[in-house]
Amino acid sequence: MDLWNWDEASPQEVPPGNKLAGLEGAKLGFCFPDLALQGDTPTATAETCWKGTSSSLASFPQLDWGSALLHPEVPWGAEPDSQALPWSGDWTDMACTAWDSWSGASQTLGPAPLGPGPIPAAGSEGAAGQNCVPVAGEATSWSRAQAAGSNTSWDCSVGPDGDTYWGSGLGGEPRTDCTISWGGPAGPDCTTSWNPGLHAGGTTSLKRYQSSALTVCSEPSPQSDRASLARCPKTNHRGPIQLWQFLLELLHDGARSSCIRWTGNSREFQLCDPKEVARLWGERKRKPGMNYEKLSRGLRYYYRRDIVRKSGGRKYTYRFGGRVPSLAYPDCAGGGRGAETQ
């Protein structure tokens, strides 16, 4: 049995260009220099090589050498391009580079890893940070820090001081809810909400809801007197209607022939139902206490003005005077319309 003599053994050398791919916990894409071992030094191990080269990397930034697996075209002994170095973190926030790029956990080919920064919660101020993640076939690509397969939802709220606050969170469906309140012509309780939702087809639906404290004033229902007198033709007069004008309206209305009618003797007319005529006149003037005695006093006022005169021979019979414009009246005796008189 031959004994191994350490003094006679040739020094062990690390082969040049070795990537040490078999070392677990380190993925180094650069070459190691040839290290000559002393005669009394045992075989070089990964720990010895690590200690020998880690001091030379102190001046370099923390690089994600594990992401080099996504670039199969890079040769084993080639130095990585300084412009295509995949930095993990936000370029504007160097604090995000604290991610341990020398992690011992092995990485597998798949989706790009998430950035080290925390995912911005809904309601946080400012825009969400961006991460530079290497993609196969490209140098770098920028993407927002969000979970794979999920969408981003933005919430907009307007505070009492008028400032607008935007926040992003993770949700199943993109949504944007914006509620604005103001005190305008519609009152302080007027609120308008917009809810535009994004559907899978790329279409946008906008829903607007508006509530107001305004009260709607309904039109007052017409009085019974106006409804009953709406069928009467109006005479051409200005100002408030007078009694003789109202009597002409009733005479021109065939539906009122039971209470007032022409006698056929020139401009003479007769009150067949004086109480009904007085009631209609009271409804028109909004005087519910109107009666025939008050109406007759108004007719006597027209006597000396030659507008209405008392016609003798019949009770409740009157005649229009010469001051009344020419009018046509039906000739009851002849069954037709009489001639115009002055």
UniProtKB/Swiss-Prot annotation:
PANTHER family xrefs: ETS (PTHR11849), ETS TRANSLOCATION VARIANT 2 (PTHR11849:SF209)
SMART domains assigned to the protein according to its UniProt record, in alphabetical order: ETS (SM00413)
InterPro entries: Ets_dom, ETS_fam, WH-like_DNA-bd_sf, WH_DNA-bd_sf
One cellular-component annotation, GO: nucleus
Source domain of life: Eukaryota
Protein name in the entry: ETS translocation variant 2
PROSITE patterns: ETS_DOMAIN_1, ETS_DOMAIN_2, ETS_DOMAIN_3
Keywords: DNA-binding, Nucleus
GO terms classed as biological process: blastocyst development; blood vessel morphogenesis; BMP signaling pathway; cell differentiation; erythrocyte differentiation; mesoderm formation; Notch signaling pathway; placenta development
Any GO MF annotation of the entry: sequence-specific double-stranded DNA binding
Family: Belongs to the ETS family.
DNA-binding region as annotated in the record: 240-320
Pfam families per the UniProt record, alphabetical: Ets (PF00178)
Function: Binds to DNA sequences containing the consensus pentanucleotide 5'-CGGA[AT]-3'.
SUPFAM superfamilies referenced in this protein's UniProt entry, alphabetically: Winged helix' DNA-binding domain (SSF46785)
Locations listed in the record: Nucleus
Lineage, top ranks: Eukaryota, Metazoa, Chordata, Craniata, Vertebrata
